[in-house]
Amino acid sequence: MKFLPTTKEEMKNLGWDSIDVLLISGDTYLDTSYNGSVLVGKWLVEHGFKVGIIAQPEVDVPDDITRLGEPNLFFAVSGGCVDSMVANYTATKKRRQQDDFTPGGVNNKRPDRAVLVYSNMIRRFFKGTTKKIVISGIESSLRRITHYDYWTNKLRKPILFDAKADILSYGMGEMSMLQLANALKNGEDWKNIKGLCYLSKEMKQDYLSLPSHSECLADKDNFIEAFHTFYLNCDPITAKGLCQKCDDRYLIQNPPSESYSEEIMDKIYSMEFARDVHPYYKKMGAVRALDTIKYSVTTHRGCYGECNFCAIAIHQGRTIMSRSQSSIVEEVKNIAGTPKFHGNISDVGGPTANMYGLECKKKLKLGACPDRRCLYPKKCLHLQVNHNNQVELLKKLKKIPNIKKIFIASGIRYDMILDDNKCGQMYLKEIIKDHISGQMKIAPEHTEDKILGLMGKDGKSCLNEFKNQFYKINNELGKKQFLTYYLIAAHPGCKDKDMMDLKRYASQELRVNPEQVQIFTPTPSTYSTLMYYTEKDPFTNQKLFVEKDNGKKQKQKDIVTEKRKNRK
């Protein structure tokens, strides 16, 4: 199936008089494997279910959201690939004018708190519906327990309490949504399906109890305790179920879905995707996001970097789920054979490109360690890093007919390259020689060790060593390529002096004037956001300076980008 239906006429052409599942998304309908709603929808179709999709429905009117009719089984609501509040506002709470996932690029289609809006629209325009409303995607996933909301500067209830929904599917949703669809179809109990949350009047036996919502409101230390327990119970092997009381009911979080095998990953990414905007939405204008992802290929999911400001470990998991080389090669061959393909693959990667195929054997058997991280403060000895598999893959991809260039645009952990004594240099040389164009983007995020420690990242000595190796190999290859650096201003603990020191180090040691500086955004369910709200280091309980004035946050950024050079 090239496209999921979004009109009655398309349903008729498929011979359907109704659908089983109605997907509703805050993004326009891009039919690619980078669209979570589409992945889930096509996975359900692969298993015999009829699925339709409504993208960016008009709010306050029934015409859009009801045009495919009521589904037989459930509604599946997502705010989109990006949290709707992050999509709509900058780190200093200014309204964004552009949206790369909206036709025409104007940010006028995605409502604030899209999951809540769409769920309420279903209750309003499908009056008396008995079909389940399931919320999913990153916006729901990261708000599944009591969470800090930056945009209102307060703790909010688990999103199920506000959304008027029945079920929350968290993390990677293909398997849990398929199991739910089968259970509802067969009239079976769904409340033990992994990867789901729901509300109950009673606690669930043998599940861990988090501090209640009211206890979190009363004492920030309770909120820290709740988050620690929540974070430690995200591993598919070791996690226990969780309960959290809110008012007179409980949020029940079942343990996470199992990590996907290579076979399942291959099946998911072997499904047919149009790699285009659905014609119904295409006529509304160009979609900028397509330029980046149309010819990009996912190699794996998950990340064990566990940077404190990042939610990938909570959403995709700390265990790497990789596709086989043959599956990736086959996808690139298919792309290379399409009529309008220009010869360049925009990206081959995942959350962290060079974690493909690299996982700790102990973790795969026993689950993630509860008392240490894989890469911080130093790489664990149990994690054997060898980039040979990735070099082999890249060489295979380069040989495919009609391929001019395979780019790696996903992030790369340069500390892992340095830790790989066997193939790290070979991998870096391969990247520099054939897989970047003019510059390589890396994300040290800061240069001051105190701030890097709060971020959960390596010290700057690692950055310096990598920089030297990068330019050494460039010189050997006769290339004039550069490193560019992603940096963060106003992270909890960071003061003006830290940004001045960063600026000095960047100028004197890195020999750059940084431009890629973003202000820290406290998104739900990260340790850095926990620091921002509590003004404490949650690992030491020590008090932290946290810059909360938006003007002063901007000043921290400007110190590095020199926009206030002539100001007092």
Curated annotation (Swiss-Prot):
Radical SAM core domain ranges (all copies): 289-562
Entry note: cofactor: Binds 1 [4Fe-4S] cluster. The cluster is coordinated with 3 cysteines and an exchangeable S-adenosyl-L-methionine.
List of residues binding [4Fe-4S] cluster: C303, C307, C310
Cofactor(s) for this UniProt protein: [4Fe-4S] cluster
Annotated TM spans: none
Annotated region described as Disordered, given as residue ranges: 546-568
Span of the signal peptide: none
Protein origin, superkingdom: Bacteria
Keywords: 4Fe-4S, Iron, Iron-sulfur, Metal-binding, S-adenosyl-L-methionine
InterPro entries: Elp3/MiaA/NifB-like_rSAM (IPR006638), Methylthiotransferase_CS (IPR020612), rSAM (IPR007197), rSAM_horseshoe (IPR023404), UPF0313 (IPR022946), UPF0313_N (IPR013704)
A GO term for molecular function: 4 iron, 4 sulfur cluster binding
Protein family according to the UniProt entry: Belongs to the UPF0313 family.
The protein, known as: UPF0313 protein FN0734
Species annotation: Fusobacterium nucleatum subsp. nucleatum (strain ATCC 25586 / DSM 15643 / BCRC 10681 / CIP 101130 / JCM 8532 / KCTC 2640 / LMG 13131 / VPI 4355)
Higher taxonomy: Bacteria, Fusobacteriati, Fusobacteriota, Fusobacteriia, Fusobacteriales
